[in-house]
Amino acid sequence: MRTWQVNDVMTTAVVTVGQGDSYRDVVDLLVSHRFSAVPVVDDFQRVTGVVSEADLLRKIEYAGAEEPRLFDGRRRRDERVKASARTAGDLMSAPPVVVPSGTSIPAAARLMDGEGVKRLPVVDDLGRLVGIVSRGDLLKVHLRPDDEIQADVEAGVLRGVITDETNAVRSTVQDGVVTLTGRVDRWSTTDIVGRLTRQVAGVVDVADELEFDYDDRNILGTGVAFGIA
């Protein structure tokens, strides 16, 4: 079964800044493009940091503020440094949170959620920038046509699991919801089919209406079929 990856949905036309670009140039870029952040790259297109609107606003926030105090915490000291920054290299947050291009879409979504970010720079094996992926990009998988989703379920799930001709399973898809009907030999087969179907890109939900001849949950012990996380 093919797993959709970040490089399937990312935006490849990426606007960047260099570490030496001026504060005003960065502001102009964000305002003119209506971006909330921009990646900073070196001469080899490796991502070295990210400058966000929040980083730029430190200059306004600390304008005319009193001198740093001895007991100021590290976060406040860092903010003061950004308030006096003149270049993207001094403004940027580093190290950047990036995602490899071959990362699965669920893994990228978990990373965004865990880091509290709305978009991620996408890098290749050498750390070079190859794209940007946003929350909206990740949601593109749910715009897949129903017939494409059904084809993946049939080829990637049913033909791989249902090898016995006596196990007849049918699938239909409407608005991303997959309905599985038919009869198989045991409960564990229905569990595996259902779990794999939920992993198909674009599946909104699975209506599992499969019937089975033998309930093997007690034998398995956990009520979860082996081999599926």
Regions found by a protein language model. Give the residues of each.
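N-terminal targeting leaders
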Residues: 1-33, 43-46, 50-229
